[in-house]
Amino acid sequence: MIRYFTAGESHGPALSAIIEGMPAGVAVSREEIDLQLRRRQQGYGRGGRMKIEQDSAEVLSGIRFGKTIGSPIALVIRNRDWENWTDKMAQFESHEATTEKITIPRPGHADLAGRIKYGFNDIRPVIDRSSARETAARVAAGSLARTFLCQLGIEIGSRISSIGPVTDTGSDKTISALLEKGAECLAGAADRSEVRMLGKKAEEDAIAAIDLAKERGDTLGGIIEIYITGVPVGLGSYVQHDRRLDSQLAAAVMAIQAIKGVEIGPAFENARKPGSEVHDALHLVKGEGVERPTNRSGGIEGSMSSGETIHIRAAMKPISSMQSPLQSFDLATLQPVLSRFERSDTCAVPAAGVVAEAVVAPVIANALFEKFGGDHLEEIRNRLNHYREAVRSAFSG
């Protein structure tokens, strides 16, 4: 079972991650990890921090000669901006007397609840750990599980279907054609857009909307569509609540900063339709197996993978740090004041799509481990291939 922990503050020396449970024998490269980190930094509407950081992962353990060795993998991502924060974020030398305390909580952030929960007299520690900067470590960790899945024929990708008022409906035929080649192909097509949208007109409108929001000192959220192809039927389980694949995927995506809603397939649209227009019919195709003319279940039926593309939609709220501040109050004086602005993005929806790809990878990998077990890539691959062949043969007629 893959599990990982991250550590580090947004303006501290570095972010780090420890990944446990990766099987031995998985070919990995620093270039692939860094590619995912670069993808996370992309997107129109990002703030000044992205001009400072050039994220790259340093591997400290768990990999030898380009392959995993089954032991915990430790990764470090240095924060270049640390040199500007050595006094404010010093670990041991005390600069408390000369460091300005942050006492005005920003609406929509972790500031107020975090300050009350942990008893700080300064909101800075809350700001720095709750920051979405932490997702760089999750992307690095997730890239390892993603690489493992790719070597088993399972791919993950995402696109952005809306930013603010702009919706990219996308051509179903275009999306289907890309997914036929694998979700990585769809991700590559999305990456060619500054906002990771597939439609050119939608891309132009989204960029204009981001520009307008920035001009007004405002921010924009949006909707992310995540796709996972090549997943065999039967991952997850209906037997216990904590083994349900859909709940595990939803939890992983909901744990991304600013994500406020998740659905599997067009779930909320399905809720407004009769069952006859929602459920996917089953067709037995001789020599091929079971096919569904639609995939409104989002690739999960009865909390298990159906064998179709897994489709997850996530709603990201607008970023809470705005240059046109909302009403707040000062914790030191208890007087009403306008909220303070912390350097931030106008829109980070495209980057959040990359983070979503990363966090679902360990979930699918763990569902594979639960089904097939194994400590080495080849052991798992052989068991998976045997299972796939058995499923195909059962319906070949």
From Swiss-Prot:
CDD domains linked: Chorismate_synthase
Positions bound to NADP(+): 40, 46
Binding site for FMN: 129-131, 257-258, 302, 317-321, 343
Biological or metabolic pathway of the protein: Metabolic intermediate biosynthesis; chorismate biosynthesis; chorismate from D-erythrose 4-phosphate and phosphoenolpyruvate: step 7/7
Reactions catalysed according to its record: 5-O-(1-carboxyvinyl)-3-phosphoshikimate = chorismate + phosphate
EC number: 4.2.3.5
InterPro entries: Chorismate_synth (IPR000453), Chorismate_synth_AroC_sf (IPR035904), Chorismate_synthase_CS (IPR020541)
Enzyme class: lyase
Cofactor note: Reduced FMN (FMNH(2)).
GO biological process: amino acid biosynthetic process; aromatic amino acid family biosynthetic process; chorismate biosynthetic process
Annotated Gene Ontology cellular component terms: cytosol
SUPFAM superfamilies: Chorismate synthase, AroC (SSF103263)
Subunit and partners: Homotetramer.
Function: This reaction introduces a second double bond into the aromatic ring system.
Name under which the protein is recorded: Chorismate synthase
Organism the protein comes from: Chlorobium phaeovibrioides (strain DSM 265 / 1930)
Chain's gene name: aroC
